[in-house]
């Protein structure tokens, strides 16, 4: 899809406005599909990055009767205050549904070591590939060691993310194990992206305004400053059912 120069320069948070407008103008009724895991399996490890992205994914998987566990491993999220808010929001929603939640290590220094030399790469570039690789490697390893034949991630539900990039990293991580496969389901189809916003408003989730890493935060704030907007204030913005 062709992107204008303006779209190429804008940080990911601004895409939220476009998504909300699309959802508001859409007359397509939401129909939740019946999900089936690959190869007839019924046990799944779901890598989750945050509550807004995982809300619809969790409800869809739960409605399909699939036995799943959430795996939260996101050392890319900085600063610590932001990381803790996103994690606690995810835990809150998991507890509401009675879904097991694995709180993996906040391997922050390892992430920075792997990101060295990529500090100025754009989003959707090689730094993001490294970031997906790192998180999915851990998810695949946990799946292998704990009897999960399938793993997937909610990252792909965001229209700002490159789904092919995410799926490539997921399959690459799973290829290391004979007993694990990556499920590259398109969470956006069937109204998934619209439902993601609806659930976020219903649950009043914390609304993060950048992807997660300090470089994304830096670039988003640079764009905001250049366009006369206030810098991001960590922990301030939450979804509202009235908006």
Swiss-Prot record:
It catalyses: epoxyqueuosine(34) in tRNA + AH2 = queuosine(34) in tRNA + A + H2O. Disulfide bonds join 211-213. Keywords: 4Fe-4S, Disulfide bond, Iron, Iron-sulfur, Metal-binding, Oxidoreductase, Queuosine biosynthesis, Redox-active center, tRNA processing. Transmembrane segments: none annotated. The keyword Cytoplasm does not apply. [4Fe-4S] cluster binds at residues 49-50, 128, 131. Residues 1-16 have a biased composition (Basic and acidic residues). GO terms for molecular function: 4 iron, 4 sulfur cluster binding; epoxyqueuosine reductase activity; metal ion binding. Pathway: tRNA modification; tRNA-queuosine biosynthesis. Residues 1-30 are annotated as: Disordered. GO terms for biological process: queuosine biosynthetic process; tRNA modification. Its EC number is 1.17.99.6. Belongs to the QueH family. Catalyzes the conversion of epoxyqueuosine (oQ) to queuosine (Q), which is a hypermodified base found in the wobble positions of tRNA(Asp), tRNA(Asn), tRNA(His) and tRNA(Tyr). HAMAP family: QueH (MF_02089). This is Epoxyqueuosine reductase QueH. The lineage of its organism: Bacteria, Pseudomonadati, Pseudomonadota, Gammaproteobacteria, Pasteurellales.
């Amino acid at each position: 899809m062709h992107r204008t120069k303006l779209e190429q320069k804008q940080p990911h948070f601004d895409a939220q406005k476009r998504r909300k407008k699309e959802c508001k103008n859409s007359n397509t009724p939401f129909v939740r599909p019946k999900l089936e895991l690959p190869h007839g399996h019924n046990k799944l490890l779901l890598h989750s990055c945050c509550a807004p992205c995982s809300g619809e994914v969790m409800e869809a998987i739960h409605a399909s009767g699939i036995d799943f566990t959430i795996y939260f491993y996101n050392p890319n999220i900085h600063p610590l205050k932001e990381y803790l808010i996103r994690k606690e929001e995810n835990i809150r929603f998991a507890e509401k549904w009675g879904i097991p939640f694995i709180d993996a290590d906040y391997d922050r220094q390892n992430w920075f070591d792997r990101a060295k030399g990529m500090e100025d790469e754009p989003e959707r570039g090689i730094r993001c590939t490294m970031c997906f690789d790192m998180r999915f490697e851990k998810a695949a390893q946990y799946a292998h060691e704990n009897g999960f034949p399938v793993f997937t991630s909610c990252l792909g539900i965001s229209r700002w993310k490159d789904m092919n990039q995410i799926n490539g990293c997921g399959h690459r991580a799973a290829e290391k194990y004979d007993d694990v496969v990556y499920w590259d389901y398109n969470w956006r189809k069937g109204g998934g992206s619209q439902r993601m916003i609806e659930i976020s408003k219903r649950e009043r989730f914390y609304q993060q305004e950048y992807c997660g890493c300090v470089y994304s935060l830096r670039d988003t704030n640079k764009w905001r400053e250049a366009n006369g907007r206030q810098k991001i204030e960590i922990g301030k913005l939450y979804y509202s059912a009235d908006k």
